[in-house]
Regions:
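Short amphipathic alpha-helices and their capping/turn segments at secondary-structure boundaries
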Residues: 1-5, 56-63, 184
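Non-catalytic pre-domain segments flanking phosphatase-related domains
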Residues: 1-13, 39
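Active-site phosphate-binding/coordination module
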Residues: 25-138
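Conserved acidic, metal-coordinating active-site core of Asp-based
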Residues: 113-217
Length: 217
């Protein structure tokens, strides 16, 4: 990684599939490359769909802290040492209830993020197992901040009991309902929708933020 004449002032790095390797870690080589960029005056920004708790754990694998964290697909922006985000735009309780109702209608479940926690159901757990079979480790379910919910009633209870606002949602629908879900979500008019296809078309996911929120365009 070369930075001739300080041509670059800022380096924005995604985590999954970019900075993190198949073991869900920052390699020593990449950590050294990021540090060399910092020494040349380049600001390092970690941009990801993950929440602040997760990103801080990965930033600890770098040789020096990044300058900024853009988390939950742009819903929260802060410096690593800050207790609170400098920019924050969350989903409202009504938004979350609408997403849950849509999931119940289509017999799927979401992931819901706060800055500190991830709530997930069977669809995301199936993805984790799929990735583990291929040798990829995305997260350890036993770690602090991860909560598995296996019924609609538990989802409603989580909305009631969680004291932090939800920053984003992610759906992992089957192929046959993915396009229809995107269409319904867009029709609601309240959300920023980012559908994507992974693993050669095997997996469709839909990231949902409050309207106007994204990692950067």
């Amino acid at each position: 990684m070369a930075f001739p004449g300080n041509q670059y002032k800022l380096l924005a790095l995604d985590l999954d599939g970019t900075l993190l390797n198949e073991k869900n870690q920052v390699s020593p080589r990449d950590a050294q490359a990021v540090r060399r960029a910092q020494e040349r005056g380049v600001q390092i920004v970690l941009c990801t769909g993950r929440n602040v708790r997760e990103v801080r754990a990965f930033s600890d694998q770098l040789l020096a802290l990044p300058d900024w964290l853009v988390t939950s697909s742009g819903a929260a922006v802060q410096r690593p040492q800050d207790a609170e985000p400098q920019f924050f735009s969350s989903l409202s309780l009504t938004h979350c209830e609408e997403i849950l109702a849509l999931c119940e209608e289509f017999e799927t479940d979401p992931c819901l993020y706060t800055t500190q926690s991830l709530y997930y159901g069977g669809a995301f757990r199936a993805l984790l197992r799929h990735l583990e079979q291929g040798g990829q480790i995305v997260m350890n379910e036993a770690d602090e901040g991860y909560f598995y919910l296996d019924s609609h009633e538990k989802w409603l209870k989580a909305l009631e009991s969680e004291t932090l606002p939800f920053t984003k949602a992610v759906l992992y629908p089957s192929h046959d309902i993915s396009d229809l879900l995107v269409s319904r979500l867009k029709h609601m008019g309240s959300f920023e929708i980012a559908p994507s296809v992974m693993f050669g078309g095997e997996l469709h996911n839909i990231e949902i933020n409050r309207r106007g929120v994204n990692k950067g365009q």
